[in-house]
Amino acid sequence: NALCPGPVLTPLLAKYLNTDERRNRRLVHIPMGRFGEAEEMVNGALFLASDESSYMTGQSLLIDGGITAAYTTPE
């Protein structure tokens, strides 16, 4: 199994997205309208490591705010 995170609001990302223009340019691609939090990624990892996922195999756990589901290839 694999944990596939989307953009997570960390100090490093916050430093890069230091203007409203830069931040909004990224947010427009996230259907949930916000960046992920580290705790949300941790919860996914804990699920994969738990007995709750004991019958889950060969899967990608997408925690990306809907980016993958909404992605369209530019023409």
Where are the regions that the model predicts?
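Conserved SDR Rossmann-fold cofactor-binding beta-strand/turn motif
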Residues: 1-9, 49-52, 62-64
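Short, flexible catalytic-loop segment of classical short-chain dehydrogenase/reductase
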Residues: 5-15, 69
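A short C-terminal helix-loop "cap" of Rossmann-like NAD(P)-dependent dehydrogenase/epimerase domains
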Residues: 15-30
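A conserved structural motif in NAD(P)-dependent oxidoreductases
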Residues: 30-41, 52
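Short, small/polar-rich loop/turn modules that mediate ligand/substrate recognition or access, typified
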Residues: 56-58
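A short alpha/beta connector and helix-capping loop motif
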Residues: 73-75
